[in-house]
């Protein structure tokens, strides 16, 4: 609705949750809720528990990453029954942007063998190993090493094209990675509450705005 820059500003605490532009985002979301676009009791399912709705034909689409492809294939859906599309443009005046989090490796600050850990890190992020690890028959993800090869997989290729050329507005992480932890926690609770009780929007936004004033 508002684009990448607005998202970053909201995540940084620079925009009020009661801003009319935030409300417009929820208004767009409310249209989907009111038309019954979500399965019943959606708030109770993990992403793994939601996949059978796709497999059994009880849901037509799911907003999820490439990691869901392997279990969907294992459940019996071949590529003739699966497809991928980028989230639709809501405002033609706003450049398309995407959420595409990057998974990272870390060495604990109190690790006892940091030198060997660093060598392992160099090994695992090498172009060759990133190609192997992220192949379609392995993790099925896009490698983080720019010199790695992207496996010739239908969905990996589509994801690569989307992030490299079809997201001119920018690429962000997930909500709970972009926002400070405390704000993200309260924000997620508010978003989940809205999906079940959309009439609570004013109360939700006031609560999140109060949290913004305290957290930032």
Question: What is the meaning of each model-derived region?
Answer:
Residues 35-37, 74-140, 189-192:
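Extracytoplasmic/periplasmic substrate-recognition and gating elements
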Residues 41-55:
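Short helix-initiation/N-cap motifs at beta->coil->alpha
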Residues 3-24, 74-77, 89-97, 148-154:
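Short, solvent-exposed loop/beta-turn-alpha elements that line the ligand-binding surface or hinge
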Residues 85, 135-186, 193:
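Long, aromatic- and glycine/proline-rich binding clefts that accommodate carbohydrate-like moieties
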Residues 47, 64-69, 101-103:
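Beta->alpha turn/N-cap motifs
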Residues 12-43:
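Glycine-centered hinge/linker elements that transmit conformational signals in sensory
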Residues 1-11, 26, 34, 99-108, ...:
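Periplasmic solute-binding protein
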Residues 56-64, 80:
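Alpha-to-beta junction loops
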